[in-house]
């Protein structure tokens, strides 16, 4: 049906879009950063700490509205784009 064809068309557009985005891996450097952070920030969530670890290992900036948690991590660059 035309609805099914439209769905596949939209799916293909989504795949094309996501292929243009660079994925950041949780590699050995990120894992080492994560282990340090995990011991320093026991109250922060594992996923947030993994995101922070990847960013620190790549010297990257985290775009987030969660400045309360991410802001606790020294040397982590964060930006909040939601307030503009």
For the regions a language model picked out, list residue spans one by one.
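PIN-domain endoribonuclease scaffold, especially VapC-family toxins
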Residues: 1-53, 83-84
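Acidic, PIN/NYN-like endoribonuclease modules and their adjacent C-terminal/linker elements
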Residues: 52, 56-84
């Amino acid at each position: 049906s035309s609805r099914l064809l439209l769905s596949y068309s939209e799916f293909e557009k989504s795949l094309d879009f996501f292929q243009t985005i660079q994925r950041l891996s949780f590699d050995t450097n990120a894992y080492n950063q994560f282990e340090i952070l995990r011991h320093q920030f026991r109250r922060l969530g594992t996923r947030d700490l993994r995101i922070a670890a990847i960013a620190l290992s790549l010297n990257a900036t985290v775009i987030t509205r969660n400045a309360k948690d991410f802001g606790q991590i020294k040397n982590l660059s964060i930006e909040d784009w939601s307030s503009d």
